[in-house]
């Protein structure tokens, strides 16, 4: 049976895992733990949910569904990738050989160093104006940023 390692357990990683396992591929997801989705307080624009759902709940349900279909999850951070006879994803504790690897590690963003900011993520602090502007309609807001992206807001 062919095998695949998916690095990352966010929406892209879980989606890839679902398709792989349903195609009969031995599927393992390496995750270093909750990512950006976990910090979303309320998601109202996700297909299939009649009521708002938190990012943590959406992540939990997605992983639960993948496990139900046979996807294995390993909590470990990928630190290397090598190829000899097979691809091998390296972690600090173990190596995971596979026929294929998908890197679905998400995006990183530059976060300003403001004391207490991390505790407000998902509770008034947002990093996606297009995603979250609806929640702040009619309210006073402050925008912090620079460069071309800021000019599009």
List where the protein language model places each region.
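Helix N-cap at the beta1-alpha1 junction of Rossmann-like dinucleotide-binding domains, i.e.
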Residues: 34-36
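Short glycine-rich loop/turn motifs that provide flexible caps or phosphate-binding loops at active sites
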Residues: 7-12, 47, 54, 105, ...
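Short, glycine/charged-enriched secondary-structure capping and boundary segments
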Residues: 20-22, 42-45, 88, 115-119
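FAD-binding core/adjacent interface of flavoenzyme oxidoreductases
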Residues: 1-5, 73-139
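Rossmann-like dinucleotide/flavin-binding elements
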Residues: 3-29, 121, 128-153
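A generic "binding-loop/recognition-motif" signal
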Residues: 10, 42, 77, 107-108, ...
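N-terminal Rossmann-like dinucleotide/flavin-binding domain of flavoprotein oxidoreductases
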Residues: 38-95
